């Protein structure tokens, strides 16, 4: 169903990643593109799929917002590999956008599953900041706390002890250093899907590495903030982007 907007053009685009046709939902402003926000979805398949309403939360009259579906999801070719080949779907999209809009600021937002997706890719890309929102920061911690997802993780990755190399390959912290783009950690204290331990662990590791970061915790909120808290979160995220661009 077409999405109508006075300020942006919505379209589902298809691009090549490892010779696979991968899809993304994009909203492009009718005015000059000065900022790009790449939204990395959570979930898998229909759960957590990219929706126009989510993209619109980050938009303004000069901001292009796009959310890749990842391979094997929502009409994209290939198989979802959960933090392996799908990482290329992110990096290829970022490079295409940077080539088309070389002067635009680029910010990545990784939500839930997308949190680790961004951590595994952002430091090697032409981005100005990374916002991890209710995001997974450690695959072992995810396996430990989400008993209900262990079967899926064993199918897609393996067992954390028997298939240690597969889990180590999905660890992002070793690749982050003091020169990495600025990171904002957003998390709810009552998040039952991705515990706030992920945020605490990431913040501690970034502190040890001397990496530039901020935290924004809403201790009374869950995985998705309630409407008043959502407004606060989005306001904080946009101001963080503004400050990063100001001090570029």
Where in the sequence are the language-model features?
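Short beta-strand element of the alpha/beta-hydrolase
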Residues: 34-43
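N-terminal cap/lid segment of alpha/beta-hydrolase-fold proteins
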Residues: 1-30
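Mobile cap/lid helix-loop segments that gate and shape the active-site cleft of serine hydrolases
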Residues: 135, 140-175
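C-terminal catalytic histidine-bearing segment of alpha/beta-hydrolase fold enzymes
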Residues: 200, 209-248
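Alpha/beta-hydrolase active-site loop
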Residues: 81-100
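Short amphipathic alpha-helix adjacent to the substrate-entry channel of hydrolases
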Residues: 49-67
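Short beta-strand/loop motif that positions the catalytic acidic residue
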Residues: 179, 185-187, 191
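Alpha/beta-hydrolase fold nucleophile elbow
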Residues: 101-112
């Amino acid at each position: 169903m077409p999405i109508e907007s006075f300020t942006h053009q919505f379209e589902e685009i298809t691009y090549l990643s490892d010779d696979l046709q991968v899809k993304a939902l994009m909203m492009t402003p009718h005015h000059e593109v000065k900022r790009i926000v790449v939204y990395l979805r959570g979930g898998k398949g229909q759960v957590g799929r990219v929706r126009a309403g989510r993209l619109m939360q980050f938009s303004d009259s000069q901001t292009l917002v796009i959310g890749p579906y990842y391979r094997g999801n929502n009409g994209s070719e290939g198989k979802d590999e959960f933090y392996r080949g799908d990482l290329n779907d992110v990096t290829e999209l970022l490079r295409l956008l940077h080539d088309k809009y070389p002067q635009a600021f680029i910010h990545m937002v990784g939500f839930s599953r997308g949190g680790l997706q961004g951590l595994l890719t952002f430091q090697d890309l032409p981005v100005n900041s990374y916002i991890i929102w209710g995001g997974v920061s450690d695959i072992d911690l995810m396996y430990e706390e989400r008993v209900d997802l262990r079967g899926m993780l064993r199918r897609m990755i393996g067992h954390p002890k028997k298939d240690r190399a597969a889990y180590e390959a999905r660890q992002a912290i070793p690749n982050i250093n003091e020169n990495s783009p600025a990171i904002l950690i957003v998390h709810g204290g009552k998040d039952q899907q991705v515990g706030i331990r992920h945020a605490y662990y990431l913040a501690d590791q970034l502190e040890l590495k001397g990496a530039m970061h901020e935290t924004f915790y809403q201790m009374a909120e869950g995985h998705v903030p309630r409407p008043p808290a959502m407004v606060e979160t989005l306001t904080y995220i946009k101001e963080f982007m503004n400050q990063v661009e100001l001090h570029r």
